[in-house]
Amino acid sequence: GNTAFKWGIHDGYQWLQKGIASYECLTSIKNDFRKLLNPSAIIISHVSRAITKQQINQLISIWPTEVYWVVSQSAQCGVFNSYQNAAQLGSDRWASLIAAWSNVHEACLVINVGTAMTVDALSDSGKFMGGIILPGVNLMRHTLSLGTQLSDPILVGAYKNLPTNTNDAIYSGVIYGLIGSIERFYNLFSLELGRPIIRCIISGGDAPVLIPFMKLPIIHVDHLVL
């Protein structure tokens, strides 16, 4: 991901172990990885900086296993890619679309809320119809603090329907913006299909921040890509 490294061990039936670490701590978990059995396959989705890819390569070099780096395809695992340049679609979004399709096999929204928020549309035939990318909760707040001349430091506010202080106004504005974007995308995609979408899969570290404000038919999956 953009800010964290997530990993999991799967035996073909279930997840045996999962973990998460900041990129600053990748070196320190190498000893933990040495205690694991040699994996028969290593599959990686990487959307961060080139230097983090080097760190990941060093981390997994303890195993002789061949590594598969996920790259978006024109079609894969029953999902068809409508991006003008298929390879330009982020591997995390592509993996999420494949995971969502394997779960529901029908039209749905795929929402990931992390450093950035993505909202993607899957049709009944498994076709990725398109999607949007926005700053996530914290990035939107941080960007606002950098781009404005507020006299006081921005603190974490609370959501209010009608905020009466700056911190609450900023936090509430972020929620308004992200929820409003999801709902607009949901409505437009439902019109495109000719019926309401009955499943919206949501994942990502900040999904719990938005879920209380969502009035859509959501399915929360903690780690959709994994």
Residue ranges and their predicted role:
Residues 1-76:
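N-terminal glycine/serine-rich phosphate-binding loop of ATP-dependent small-molecule kinases
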Residues 1-16, 100, 104-128, 144:
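Gly/Thr-rich phosphate-binding beta-strand-loop-beta motif of the actin/hexokinase/Hsp70
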Residues 9, 60, 77-80, 209-216:
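Short loop/helix-cap segments at secondary-structure boundaries that form the rim of catalytic
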Residues 149, 175, 218-226:
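Glycine-rich phosphate-binding/hydrolytic loop that grips phosphoryl groups
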Residues 77-108:
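Conserved phosphate-binding catalytic cores of ATP/NTP-utilizing and phosphoryl-transfer enzymes
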Residues 158-199, 206, 217-218:
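Adenine-nucleotide phosphate-binding core of ATP-dependent small-molecule kinases
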Residues 98, 102-105, 129-174:
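Glycine-rich phosphate-binding loop plus the immediately following alpha-helix
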Residues 4, 45-52, 197-213:
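Glycine-rich phosphate-binding loops at beta-strand->alpha-helix junctions
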